[in-house]
Amino acid sequence: MMRLLILVALLSAGGWLYYRLIYFFRDPERRIPEGNNIVAPADGTIVYVHIVEDGHVPISVKEDKIIQLEEITKTSMPTGRFWHVGIFMSPYDVHINRTPVAGEVRFRKHYKHQNLPMRWMETRRMLRLRPLYKDALHITENERNTLLIDGDLPVWVVQIADEYVNKIDCWIGEGDTVYKGQRFGRIVMGSQVDLIFPDREGIRIVVEEGQHVKAGESIVACY
């Protein structure tokens, strides 16, 4: 019996080490689609996709309080209509982030703050409960890194950290030129990446809530 317990303990420890040292850091190649499109910046599940008008984000995470777009980006935003897409990354998704479009990095800002857990969103995702963002206070509160990539159209990317994340990796900065699907960062464990871009004539959204996407490969919108 003791030998069995030791074997189980060793296998469990080995599995945990494999996940933490090998599986978590996997970085598969991706087929970057050609054409006029915006690709997913992260692997994960689409938790919301909606239009933002006058800076008002049409979701509520606490007591029906209206969220302002600038609460998510932590920086000033131009006026107008924007598409806002959220991608939740579970601990088992690939955690490498990729640029959604080609262009020049015009802006980068890191916002440090106390991190709240994302477990409510993970639970609702697993149970397929809608809306997936209910009670997800991390959307506006947690540490984050915001990028503005200016290409055919301006695209904001917001990396949002989870409770257990003490570091957001971002390997590009202001003035850098990037190509679509380029590796630009990583967030450890579970986390979230939001995507914001103008609602211009010809924009067509091709994802929906609950859909799983792959960074650099899955098309979010065409233009």
Locations of regions flagged by a protein language model:
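Contiguous, well-folded functional domains in the mature portion of proteins
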Residues: 1-223
